[in-house]
């Protein structure tokens, strides 16, 4: 049933690998392909997919009589990997041991995006600018207007931080 189809865990690992290689366009294209909403945009597509359009399927069948049908939607760990691929590897927001690091790998066409991250009682308003149309590579990070290195120590003391990332 999975021959020639989509095995979601491995497909997500391919997305992560694409970002590690700096291929943000391809990574985002694959990310969108796996998105269950993309399998249910029309009534016909929903009938073919046959599973919930709001849950990641463990696999999407490739055999001709089942081609495009999702399977094992509530029985997979793929959703956590999908979330991780999107947040940490494409958008580039990584949190580890009390520090934030921002390393996006995005499509060249994305000129700007924003993330608001709450940690304990603090809020981090993050604006990523990609005016040069790059897939990856951070040239500058400013925290509240001051240039800093890429590791930001998280502070949970009810502060609001403005982070500007230039690619």
Label each region the model flagged.
Residues 1-6, 12-167:
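Non-catalytic C-terminal accessory modules of carbohydrate-active enzymes
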